[in-house]
Amino acid sequence: MKLKLKNVFLAYFLVSIAGLLYALVQLGQPCDCLPPLRAAAEQLRQKDLRISQLQADLRRPPPVPAQPPEPEALPTIYVITPTYARLVQKAELVRLSQTLSLVPRLHWLLVEDAESPTPLVSGLLAASGLLFTHLAVLTPKAQRLREGEPGWVRPRGVEQRNKALDWLRGKGGAVGGEKDPPPPGTQGVVYFADDDNTYSRELFKEMRWTRGVSVWPVGLVGGLRFEGPQVQDGRVVGFHTAWEPNRPFPLDMAGFAVALPLLLAKPNAQFDATAPRGHLESSLLSHLVDPKDLEPRAANCTQVLVWHTRTEKPKMKQEEQLQRQGQGSDPAIEV
């Protein structure tokens, strides 16, 4: 048994010696290992280069995006708003003023249907932060709505809009805010914004560069989902309307804007209080432009950016009952 173990050990030793000698011989042989090593080194170099490029990109300041024109370079939008005393007047004017505050380079011409300015409107304008001109003119009694008459029987806001046009033409009359009219050569656009409508601020971007008279659809008006111009090949070819489609300009007051230089060049252009029902807009526009020269806006008049909304008249039954009992709401609190 001892002999066999000795023989096994000897054989293991000889085999190990032979393996060691073979390994030593192989170490001395030429090895073709350089190409793989060079390839690996090149990959590492490329990765290092890419990392350096990414680090440089992170340190580089971002490109400056194209900037819109500075407010001073924009034509001024003159927004003319007639208003009259009623329970919802302040609520309407607050909503409108906060929409207008989002629009750069805007001048608000707010015209009260009153003999003189009221504290409510004066205070609201002062707090609005807007550039404004405060005007006031009373609607003649013959033109006023009578008790129980629907609003569409007589045109409203005629005297007030014309008062604002007079101010733009240098005839004065301001009772608050900016007193001086725009100097000759001023580039701007005039828009008639009633205090009860709803306006997207995008609308003002659309009208700002008006050259003559620009137009667009108005939502929720004339018994339709919208009224507005029909456009073909970039030109107005008709009007989508249901009531008296043969009017010279079947447009809503909120559906157009006029370049200021055009208005100033036509001193007789104004609204006619005696115009037939529904023709108030036409009474002004007929002095200014031919229908074929209207400038379609709002994606060729396919977008609605203004809505002819109406605030519901508040029901004051409980207030009246408390007033009869001498317990009405505090009149010193402005609503």
UniProtKB/Swiss-Prot annotation:
* Annotated InterPro entries: Glyco_trans_43, Nucleotide-diphossugar_trans
The segment annotated Disordered runs over: 312-335
Top-level division of the source organism's lineage: Eukaryota
> Could you state one GO cellular component term attached to this entry?
Golgi apparatus
- Detail which positions bind UDP-alpha-D-glucuronate: 82-84, 113, 156, 161, 194-196, 308-310
Q: Name one GO biological process term.
A: heparan sulfate proteoglycan biosynthetic process
Output compositional bias ranges, type Basic and acidic residues: 312-322
Which UniProt keywords are listed?
A: Disulfide bond, Glycoprotein, Golgi apparatus, Manganese, Membrane, Metal-binding, Signal-anchor, Transferase, Transmembrane, Transmembrane helix
The record's listing under CDD domains reads: GlcAT-I
Positions annotated as glycosylated: 300
List where the protein spans the membrane. Answer: 8-28
* Signal sequence bounds: none
Pathway annotation: Protein modification; protein glycosylation
Q: Does the keyword Transit peptide apply?
A: no
Q: What class of enzyme is it?
A: transferase
Q: Which cofactor does it need?
A: Mn(2+)
Topological domain (Lumenal) residues are 29-335
Q: Which Pfam families match?
A: Glyco_transf_43
Q: How does it sit in the membrane?
A: Single-pass type II membrane protein
* Catalytic reactions of this protein: 3-O-(beta-D-galactosyl-(1->3)-beta-D-galactosyl-(1->4)-beta-D-xylosyl)-L-seryl-[protein] + UDP-alpha-D-glucuronate = 3-O-(beta-D-GlcA-(1->3)-beta-D-Gal-(1->3)-beta-D-Gal-(1->4)-beta-D-Xyl)-L-seryl-[protein] + UDP + H(+)
Of which family is this protein a member?
Answer: Belongs to the glycosyltransferase 43 family.
Subunit comment: Homodimer; disulfide-linked. Interacts with PXYLP1; the interaction increases the 2-phosphoxylose phosphatase activity of PXYLP1 during completion of linkage region formation in a B3GAT3-mediated manner.
Q: What is this protein called?
A: Galactosylgalactosylxylosylprotein 3-beta-glucuronosyltransferase 3
